[in-house]
């Protein structure tokens, strides 16, 4: 997916239901035409085209609706407001430290936090960071207003009232940090001193607040995300053996690491340069699995120390953050390998093979299937499939390319969609005309049979599998009928034994497609077997070839086994031979 793409959404029914994504395209006019066509053909009650612009600095997309049409009037929503809608209202300063409040602040202030190389917990416990934040003015006020607008949409209070309430809460919380900094509540500590502090604080009601204040000071000396992560992980060595102090320090470290990993800027810096999203995800998976991560530019000390912690199943919140990030990226719109769909599919399979080994309490099987199904859905639309087939010169090559797609996507509905692209290729006149032009008929028929065999082995549902197989069989029948291939064998080879042996070899070599063509070949073969004197003549011929003699029953059994291998039941074979 390029830096800019256009998403087409539709709404079905006039009751104002939710919007569902139909397709993502790189061409603006093509996306608009597709949306208008859906309205004209009655495929949607309302449509919307959204321009998505990728911002490499944050790893996120900026959305802009460029077209809406249809009869259903739906209240327009701001995506950024929707992202904040789950924010639980805060009624006292302590509520600002809750998990949901911190996650909301991370989403709203992500860009600013990334530039400052801060986590939200550091910001909320550092007087110097809060002074810098207040000095921005607009960033602070915009954050408050965004939350207020989201809350006002779900309450009877006005935006102005909620802004005032949030400003009062934030001011109280900020001034508390300033006051505690002045009275030196947050000790400036070095490694080796945090364990004793955690033990001392124990079950104190303000223990987490005080410890985080000291951790924020300690991390303030780190100039890079890697240095910050390494400084945190060093503290794992001084965890108290047991008791409230151990849980206190471990949870504080885990939370700070998780916040780093939830930030796009921090994670990108920790993983180093990657050529594309696919390779970045591979590194994420390696990290999640607790194996060595190959980070460019000689960095990676922090990320590999974290991998070692994950290998010991430590830091569950941080590991869950990585799992969530992997799933989010898999479900996202950005291509794994933008320059090549072949590489895209290889990368998708590679990621799948690794993640299967990692499923468990952090990554469920259902979540993985849902993520891969969502990504697969974006690959079975017109634009990527046409791009994937553009190097194919003939229709059979296009069909083969689509079978490669089938092998690398997940989801029954996605495979059903893919089958709708395959049937028209097979039923087109070009399919037979372009199929190994100039090659001998057996070679052309074998090519169709090989494609059919791949379809029958595929993961298509039985309905789609049978439809494609029947279409290929029909194409093979037309090729055979046009060349009068079987008729020529019957006319050219008068000897029933030679004719039967020829047909048996052709069937065993996979020349004929399963279905009507194979049945036609079997009927011709059975007719040869049923010729008077076939068996006695066949045995006499074998006796000439084998001076040691032959056993009649053994000959019949061998022949029946060969015939069973091409789908003729032993009883039918024996009946024909006895004629």
In which residue ranges do the predicted regions lie?
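Phosphoinositide-binding peripheral membrane targeting modules
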Residues: 20-26, 41-43
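Short aromatic-glycine-(Arg/Gly/Cys) micro-motifs in beta-strand/loop hairpins
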Residues: 1-20
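Non-catalytic all-alpha helical scaffold/repeat segments
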Residues: 101, 105-579
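Generic structural motif
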Residues: 11-14, 28, 52-54
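Short, mixed-charge low-complexity intrinsically disordered segments
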Residues: 40-123
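Surface-exposed loop/edge segments in extracytoplasmic proteins
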Residues: 15-22, 56-61
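Charged, amphipathic alpha-helical segments
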Residues: 27-37
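Short linear motifs in intrinsically disordered
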Residues: 1, 36-41
